[in-house]
A protein has these predicted regions:
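N-terminal helix-rich module
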Residues: 59-62, 66-82, 107-110, 143-144, ...
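N-terminal single-pass transmembrane signal-anchor helix
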Residues: 1-18, 22, 26
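Disulfide-bonded cysteine motifs in exported proteins
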Residues: 56-57, 92-100, 121-122, 144-145
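Membrane-proximal extracytoplasmic alpha-helices
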Residues: 21-40
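Alpha-helix exit/C-cap motif
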Residues: 35-64, 80-89, 93
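Short, surface-exposed interaction loops/tails
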Residues: 108-151
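Short, surface-exposed beta-strand/loop micro-motifs that present aromatic residues
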Residues: 89-106, 115
Length: 151
């Protein structure tokens, strides 16, 4: 009986550790995808006459259909980061009003920023922007549709 109790205690410790590892892995995936988005955004910028804006809401660096020649927007990378966080979509230019727990991507001709909530409870958000910032914050850094920096 004592052996069974010890096995039960050890298995609960192992299961708790596995859950923590999964959450940290999801946070790493969020950060990795958003880092890839930054590189993709610069390719988009260079191919789009030094602009992150394609002229319409459906052709900018954040949109799902954005193209600059043959260079795709960052939407798929931000969406992958959102999926790692358990979110099914990305709010483009704050169509959801900057609500907490939402993945956001805003852009203008001169800049862009993307933010995704981290999976770890209480860890907040991870935000990247066209200025090179990579910030983890417990507050929502993109709270209106003019926010294109993580500050």
């Amino acid at each position: 009986l004592v052996v069974i109790a010890i096995i039960g205690i050890l298995s609960s410790v192992v299961l708790a550790s596995l859950n923590t590892a999964r959450t940290k892995g999801a946070d790493a995936a969020i950060k990795s995808n958003l880092a890839g988005a930054r590189a993709q955004a610069e390719l988009f910028y260079d191919s789009n006459s030094n602009s992150y804006d394609g002229g319409t809401a459906t052709s900018d660096v954040c949109s799902a259909t954005g193209l600059a020649g043959t260079v795709k927007s960052i939407h798929s990378a931000v969406l992958a980061a959102a999926a790692a966080s358990g979110i099914a979509s990305v709010s483009i230019d704050l169509t959801t009003g900057g609500a907490a727990g939402v993945a956001n991507c805003n852009s203008t001709a001169a800049g862009w920023a993307a933010q995704v909530p981290l999976k770890t409870t209480g860890a907040g958000y991870y935000c990247v922007d066209s200025l090179g910032a990579s910030i983890t914050s417990t507050t929502n850094l993109i709270s209106n549709n003019t926010d294109v920096t993580c500050s």
